[in-house]
Amino acid sequence: MSAKEVRFGTDARGRMLKGINTLADTVKITLGPKGRNVILDTSYGAPRITKDGVTVAREIELSDRFENVGAQMVKEVASRTNEEAGDGTTTATVLAQAIAKEGMKAVAAGMNPMDLKRGIDRAVAIVIAEIRSMSRPVGDSAEIAKVGALSANGEAAIGRQIADAMAKVGTAGVIKVEENKGLETETEVVEGMQFDRGYLSPYFITHAQKMVVELDDCAILLHEGKLTSLASMVPLLEAVVQAEKQLLVVAEDVEGEALTTLVVNKLRGGLKVAAAKAPGFGDGRAAMLEDLAVLTGAHLISAELGTKLETVTLDMLGFAKKVVLTKDSTILIDSAGDKAAIASRIGQIRNQIEDTTSAYNKEKLQERLARLAGGVAVIRVGGATEIEVKERRDRVEDTLNATRAAVQEGVVPGGGAALIHAGKALAGLKGDNPDQDAGIKIIRRAIQAPLRQIADNAGIDGSVVAGKVIENDSATFGFDAQLETYGDMLQAGIIDPTKVVRIALEDAASIAGLLITTEVIIAHKPERGERMSQMDEMGGMM
């Protein structure tokens, strides 16, 4: 086992706080409409320019192990907020720094860390309850566009594109963000269900110029296993031809004689047909095949379910008015599934989403839900250079996450105003002892930090701005950093998703509470080579 270094008390917290400040000071300059960019050096290719808080935080790794502990803990705030809310990472970082800074000062002054944390937790619960009471639902696409524009640093076009995409595919629909090769940012909406598997052979192509397969009035065979021979389903193929239908075969794989038979039938003109692999892997593949069966009205052919190819009849196939296959994807349009069965399947998946604790499983379930419930929209982000495209893509993804959060829990006045006004509910709140009172005061001060930072980044004294907002009795009064004016945030269209504000405060207080109650840090002792490297970085002063 390698040697370890141990730091106690004030020494440990001081080193940790230095790391916290290094990371937070780097991230918080990106906050607000006049926040600055950060350039990230990359190991290959051009440098990356971003205003995304969690992207900046992930790049920071400090050479001092004890300082790095503090930095990594605050990085965890940004990561957790990003995972839970999808936005608000910079706000969470600013809050965590403010709470940790004030809390460590209080501990150094001799206050009990555990009582401080109890006071902090009590105050946070009150503020969160007040934020929930201030929240109001998102009204329409225009309001969704406002949320999007704000998250995209005032770029209204991005907000409108996301609002339009949501209007078409539904708030539960899949919206993908990709990079475009052109200058423009475009939105393409796919009506129907799409999965990421394309045609198995280019011989199935029906439109050589577009390199796609298009099947109309299409029967769909869903098979859970591999198909290596079609001898047992010749009667079915004949029935499809007699019914003047076209055919899509979806299976774990179609290979050998089975694939050859389908290709020959297509080339001879006897049957317009295509084959694709089933989407997903393992248990996920079986679940997605069942989704496809419900959506298209098909019977899933599976040994486990007791169905065999030789017993399949025409009425066991699914149907869609149109199927489009590229080399990478398959789209089913206007499928013939029973609406009640589809609604029941959607309900099952929603229940599974609520029950699962795995972030990965939740993401996959949400993708399945979206495919069944809404459809698919693709936003292709354009730009003049690769660097610009990547920076814009970051902003579009943040905007998309913010709008989804707004739809889920509603919106509150933006620009840090909601936290300021919710904090007024702490007036007169008392803890069980003076140390808990100090914890409550820490939150009263810390929740001003995002507004102060937004103002500072706009070149205006944050203390003055915070004071004016606190003095006003209106719960919607705030500061518009873009125009450098005061007014009603809701009327100005400056709104934040309630979920983003709530989770940013919860996660910041949670991690900061752990930092405040830390008394000892144990870190790996640097090896000789590392110590020499650190001496070189300090100019060799020893």
From Swiss-Prot:
The lineage of its organism: Bacteria, Pseudomonadati, Pseudomonadota, Alphaproteobacteria, Rhodobacterales. It comes from Cereibacter sphaeroides (strain ATCC 17023 / DSM 158 / JCM 6121 / CCUG 31486 / LMG 2827 / NBRC 12203 / NCIMB 8253 / ATH 2.4.1.) (Rhodobacter sphaeroides). This is Chaperonin GroEL 2. Its EC number is 5.6.1.7. Belongs to the chaperonin (HSP60) family. It holds the Pfam family Cpn60_TCP1. Keywords: ATP-binding, Chaperone, Cytoplasm, Isomerase, Nucleotide-binding. It is an enzyme of class 5 (isomerase). PANTHER family: 60 KDA HEAT SHOCK PROTEIN, MITOCHONDRIAL (PTHR45633). Signal peptide: none annotated. ATP binds at residues 30-33, 51, 87-91, 415, 496. InterPro entries: Chaperonin_Cpn60_CS (IPR018370), Cpn60/GroEL (IPR001844), Cpn60/GroEL/TCP-1 (IPR002423), GroEL-like_apical_dom_sf (IPR027409), GROEL-like_equatorial_sf (IPR027413), TCP-1-like_intermed_sf (IPR027410). One of its GO terms (biological process) is protein refolding. It is found in: Cytoplasm. GO terms for cellular component: cytoplasm. The keyword Translocase does not apply. Forms a cylinder of 14 subunits composed of two heptameric rings stacked back-to-back. Interacts with the co-chaperonin GroES. Its main location: cytoplasm. It catalyses: ATP + H2O + a folded polypeptide = ADP + phosphate + an unfolded polypeptide. Coiled coil: none annotated.
